[in-house]
Regions:
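Proteins enriched for Cys/Gly/acidic motifs involved in redox and nucleic-acid/cofactor modification
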Residues: 1-170
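Active-site/ligand-binding neighborhood in enzyme catalytic cores
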Residues: 173
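Alpha-helix-loop-beta-strand connector modules within alpha/beta enzyme cores
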Residues: 176-182
Length: 182
């Protein structure tokens, strides 16, 4: 992930001139919450609002057309966040649903456990689920990168690692390995 070297991060929205909303769209409630949050920001702030996450694929284009957000970018574009947030013109860049994240996270500020994404997407096509359409097919993160991330985090004092993904049980099916081998 980007180092955010061009931005100063704050948790106080009143101080922010840029707000990035990492949205979820798994449930109707999550979508509603995102739209409600954007409305709250519109009332109380003049900050530029950017939408990323799963909602970029389901609601992003409409929110951009309504001028409720300045920019929309998908999961695969988060690695370019510095350049995206610096754009003056509104944009819609949903990204690539086949992208495999190559970023390595060195730290989790304020956390005692480290979360390691090992897998993304899902090959199941459950009739009630939107995940394959907003996250793409199942794909595994590179084993070397996963182990590198764990090593870096261990050097930063973490001793507990939680392996995460959309469907962790499918880890390795696309790369001819398995969770047990990892």
């Amino acid at each position: 992930m980007s180092s955010m070297k061009d931005f100063e991060i704050t948790e106080n929205e009143e101080e922010a001139d840029t707000i990035v909303i990492n949205s979820c769209t798994v449930t109707n409630g999550a979508d509603t919450h995102v739209r409600s949050y954007i409305s709250q920001i519109e009332k109380n702030s003049s900050a530029k609002v950017f939408l990323t996450g799963c909602g970029a694929h389901t609601k992003g284009e409409k929110l951009l057309e309504e001028k409720r957000v300045h920019g929309v970018f998908g999961q695969s574009e988060k690695e370019n966040i510095d350049a995206l947030l610096a754009q003056d013109q509104p944009f819609y860049n949903p990204g690539d649903l086949n992208h495999v994240d190559t970023s390595v996270v060195d730290d989790f500020i304020g956390k005692s456990r480290a979360f390691i994404k090992i897998q993304e997407g899902c090959n199941f096509r459950c009739s009630y689920c939107i995940i394959p359409f907003v996250r793409g097919d199942a794909r595994s993160m590179d084993e070397t990168r996963i182990l590198e991330q764990i090593s870096r985090l261990a050097l930063n004092g973490f001793g507990e690692f939680i392996l995460t993904g959309t469907n962790v049980g499918s880890y390795g099916q696309d790369t001819k390995t398995s969770l047990a081998k990892l």
